[in-house]
Design a protein with these regions (language model features):
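Conserved short hydrophobic interaction patches
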Residues: 25, 90-94, 181
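Glycine-rich, aromatic-bearing surface loops/beta-hairpins
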Residues: 111-214
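Solvent-exposed interaction surfaces and binding hotspots enriched for charged
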Residues: 2-10, 56-75, 181-182, 186-188
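Short, well-structured alpha-helical interface segments that form or flank functional binding sites
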Residues: 17, 34, 83
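Short linear interaction motifs
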Residues: 11-23
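Short, intrinsically disordered low-complexity segments
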Residues: 61-119, 126, 135-138
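N-terminal interaction modules that seed assembly of large macromolecular complexes
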Residues: 22-78
């Protein structure tokens, strides 16, 4: 469980803080890690659970600012699906979950490299992965059930906290895929989770170092 307790005066700020803390925690762990999915739950509601482990309760109580908008990111394990897109297509959340977030890595290449890529998807993945102009990005995207979104994008070549690009819709495909997990099951039509040309297999991404131009 990752707690992100920096204080929040609104739902939007609570989401921004949660995404920022997930991204920084991921940065501390380093690169070349598997995608992770989080449930975003109001910290105050977590503390009301009798079954909350004592060590987690102590940690949350010592850092919570008592804001109803402060969220705790709870990592999800044993998820369905073999890749991120398939996993998100099968996810649904109980009402107690206010939002969701994903942390994933992708290969980034310049637009001209994307234009010259092979048409075969698998060949394109290999082409991007081995191209000398490639870079890698770590994308953290979070959404709230009510529709708000926030994204953080860090490139491996500019691996500093002050170089992380942030915005509401930097990776629209991933935002849409996360929002779809809150739709009624019969109404779901989950978009490709990669967004901006980032397929779940690690395809090219049109993200510049200052943000994601998708």
């Amino acid at each position: 469980m990752d707690d992100n307790q920096l204080g929040a005066s609104s739902p939007e700020e609570g989401l921004t803080v949660a995404v920022t803390e997930i991204e920084r925690s991921a940065a501390q762990l380093g690169w070349d890690r598997a995608s992770t999915v989080y449930a975003l739950v109001p910290t105050g509601e977590l503390l009301e659970l009798d079954e909350l482990p004592a060590d987690m309760r102590d940690q949350l109580e010592s850092t919570w600012d008592h804001s109803p908008h402060t969220l705790t990111a709870v990592i999800q394990e044993d998820l369905p699906g073999t890749d991120l897109e398939e996993t998100l297509a099968q996810l649904g959340w109980p009402e107690s979950v206010l939002g969701a977030a994903v942390c994933t890595e992708r290969v980034m290449v310049p637009p001209e490299v994307q234009d010259s890529a092979p048409e075969d998807p698998q060949e394109a993945v290999e082409y991007f992965a081995n191209h000398p102009d490639r870079d890698e990005v770590r994308i953290v995207t979070g959404v709230l059930r009510s529709g708000e979104s926030w994204c953080a994008v860090r490139t491996r070549s500019h691996d500093e906290d002050d170089e992380v690009a942030q915005g509401m819709n930097l990776v629209p495909g991933l935002v849409d895929a996360l929002l779809a997990t809150f739709a009624p099951a019969q109404a779901r039509d989950v978009p490709a989770a990669g967004g901006c040309g980032c397929g779940s297999g690690g395809g090219g991404c049109g993200c510049g170092s200052g943000g994601c131009g998708c």
